[in-house]
Amino acid sequence: MNKNNVLRGLLVLAGLSLSSLALAHGDVTPQAVDTKGLEPLGKEWRDTNPYRKPYAKHDLAVEIGASAYNQNCARCHGLEAKSGGIAPDLRLLETGAEGDEWFKERVINGAVRDGAVYMPKMADFISQEGLWAIRSYLESVHVDE
């Protein structure tokens, strides 16, 4: 009987540990993005990613974008942009202007279906600079299907 109680206790502990890992991807509340060092873009949205190569500070944009992605996007879209099936795998997003168009539309308008919010309007919380830095990061981890 004592062994059964110990086993049950270990199973509960293991379950709690695993559930905390599931929540460790990111915070639900959007986090500020420090874009120091990137060209300020102003209020009007660009149609294409201004931080794409040959932008001189492209590598800095990718670094900022990786951090911002992990803080704001990974909870739903997965660590390193590898989706676990909850939300689209952003590594598969088209590169270049076509992918920029979809990205811009989604971060500005979010995703709502039948009144349920599947993705918040991230542009309400994160600057254009921060979001284009995230886009730069996503292009750096792009994979073909």
UniProtKB/Swiss-Prot annotation:
<keyword id="KW-0813">Transport</keyword>
<feature type="binding site" description="axial binding residue">
    <location>
        <position position="119"/>
    </location>
    <ligand>
        <name>heme c</name>
    </ligand>
</feature>
<dbReference type="InterPro" id="IPR036909">
    <property type="entry name" value="Cyt_c-like_dom_sf"/>
</dbReference>
<keyword id="KW-0732">Signal</keyword>
<dbReference type="GO" id="GO:0042597">
    <property type="term" value="C:periplasmic space"/>
</dbReference>
<keyword id="KW-0574">Periplasm</keyword>
<keyword id="KW-0479">Metal-binding</keyword>
<dbReference type="InterPro" id="IPR051811">
    <property type="entry name" value="Cytochrome_c550/c551-like"/>
</dbReference>
<dbReference type="InterPro" id="IPR030991">
    <property type="entry name" value="c550_proteobact"/>
</dbReference>
<comment type="subunit">
    <text>Monomer. Interacts with the quinoprotein ethanol dehydrogenase (QEDH) ExaA.</text>
</comment>
<feature type="domain" description="Cytochrome c">
    <location>
        <begin position="60"/>
        <end position="142"/>
    </location>
</feature>
<dbReference type="GO" id="GO:0009055">
    <property type="term" value="F:electron transfer activity"/>
</dbReference>
<feature type="binding site" description="axial binding residue">
    <location>
        <position position="77"/>
    </location>
    <ligand>
        <name>heme c</name>
    </ligand>
</feature>
<dbReference type="InterPro" id="IPR009056">
    <property type="entry name" value="Cyt_c-like_dom"/>
</dbReference>
<keyword id="KW-0249">Electron transport</keyword>
<keyword id="KW-0408">Iron</keyword>
<feature type="binding site" description="covalent">
    <location>
        <position position="73"/>
    </location>
    <ligand>
        <name>heme c</name>
    </ligand>
</feature>
<comment type="function">
    <text>Is an essential component of the ethanol oxidation system that allows P.aeruginosa to grow on ethanol as the sole carbon and energy source. Is the direct electron acceptor of the quinoprotein ethanol dehydrogenase (QEDH).</text>
</comment>
<comment type="pathway">
    <text>Alcohol metabolism; ethanol degradation; acetate from ethanol.</text>
</comment>
<dbReference type="GO" id="GO:0020037">
    <property type="term" value="F:heme binding"/>
</dbReference>
<keyword id="KW-0349">Heme</keyword>
<protein>
    <recommendedName>
        <fullName>Cytochrome c550</fullName>
    </recommendedName>
</protein>
<dbReference type="Pfam" id="PF13442">
    <property type="entry name" value="Cytochrome_CBB3"/>
</dbReference>
<feature type="binding site" description="covalent">
    <location>
        <position position="76"/>
    </location>
    <ligand>
        <name>heme c</name>
    </ligand>
</feature>
<dbReference type="GO" id="GO:0046872">
    <property type="term" value="F:metal ion binding"/>
</dbReference>
<feature type="signal peptide">
    <location>
        <begin position="1"/>
        <end position="24"/>
    </location>
</feature>
